[in-house]
Amino acid sequence: MHVIVLGSGVIGTTTAYYLARQGAKVTVLDRQPEAACETSYANAGQVSPGYSTPWAAPGIPFKALKWLFQKDAPLAIRPDGTLYQWRWMAAMLANCTAGRYTVNKERMLRLAEYSRDCLRELRADTGIQYEARTLGTLQLFRSASQYQAAQRDIQVLDACGVPYELLDSARLQTVEPALARTAHKLAGGLRLPNDETGDCRLFTRRLAQLAAGLGVEFRYGQDVEALVAGGAEIRGVRVGGETLAADRYVAAFGSYTRGFLAPLGLELPVYPVKGYSLTIPLASAEAAPVSTVLDETYKVAITRFDNRIRVGGMAELAGFDLGLNPAHRRTLEHVVTDLYPGCGEVAQAEFWTGLRPMTPDSTPIVGATRYANLFLNTGHGTLGWTMACGSGKVVADLVTGQRPAIRADDLALARYQAAQTRHAGPALGERSAA
């Protein structure tokens, strides 16, 4: 079986690796000169199943309204001139009920926990090195109200069997010693000891090398134009004036997957949510975090690599704009210097932005389409690194006709089509017949 995978980010590369492990002939196509050049390039570095929480949650509509008028707010909305942006936001708001939150959180945790298990197995099998740390992650609360609100997530963690520790401010330094200097600013934290960290770009590029060793062909610098459909199947993919044919196809172009598949009549409910990061040279190990902390107020993560610190966060709904907003750099700098003063050479930091493919229910789109040989692996939002190995393994199983180890039917695009049948008129997820 020959499979063409479209995209060489962490999602496409893990998919290709698992397909090759299952005996498929695999070709990966990407416009970039090497793997992990776009959204996987400089993300926050967290592998955090326990923090797999839907953006669409009770209370978010009120918070979003407040953030619109707040300096250093974690969310910014800039009209991109399309009706789709507003339709997508409306669909997200429709998921901000307690019932939908519970359903979406369970699906996300299921995939994320499985993905972490797959990552650990892959690491044990291959010895892959990517500056990984298995010291857990710590969510920091600056106010008593945030600390109390964590009880809701704890109930879900209990139900899903996810270990955790709720720490008051005095105990924060027991897991993050450098916080001893700034714990007086904090109300407490929620620690998830099973979460991990690591450099996603380094992982992806080294996994691409391992996949190539299994026979995967990576064709970089490719002008991938379109898929060619014939009836209920895909017949090929047009690349730089030629058409390449395969038995199966996997679309993993991140935020660009929606536009790429639109000519086929598929409308993926994916929107590019812009995120920012700083990569800071380490100045003092004693002043730096030992793993990852997440500032709940600013929605900013601070992650320790070997000799670097990655600070990532923010969410900007502005279409496909990749401009660097200096105000967001100031926010990232403020958070890291406020919590970990003197930890790094902030003035020498690399400032970066990427587009995270987000769905209205925060759950990725993983699985089949109405085209018999076309599969999707996109829409992971801020959790692409966390969910990559599990998503890649699930898609590889589906493509090769094997049964996935976890329930996966409710991860597919069909969940949006099912919603359409329950309501009058077309909904996000599939175009109505013309």
UniProtKB/Swiss-Prot annotation:
Catalytic reactions of this protein: a D-alpha-amino acid + A + H2O = a 2-oxocarboxylate + AH2 + NH4(+)
UniProt pathway annotation: Amino-acid degradation; D-alanine degradation; NH(3) and pyruvate from D-alanine: step 1/1
One MF annotation (Gene Ontology) recorded for this entry: D-amino-acid dehydrogenase activity
Known cofactor(s): FAD
UniProt keyword terms in alphabetical order: FAD, Flavoprotein, Oxidoreductase
UniProt enzyme class: oxidoreductase
EC number: 1.4.99.-
SUPFAM superfamilies assigned to the protein according to its UniProt record, in alphabetical order: FAD-linked reductases, C-terminal domain, FAD/NAD(P)-binding domain
GO CC term, one of those recorded: plasma membrane
Disulfide bonds: none
Residues involved in FAD binding: 3-17
GO biological-process terms attached to the record: D-alanine catabolic process
Protein family per UniProt: Belongs to the DadA oxidoreductase family.
NCBIfam families documented for this protein: PRK00711.1
Function in brief: Oxidative deamination of D-amino acids.
Protein name: D-amino acid dehydrogenase
The encoding gene: dadA
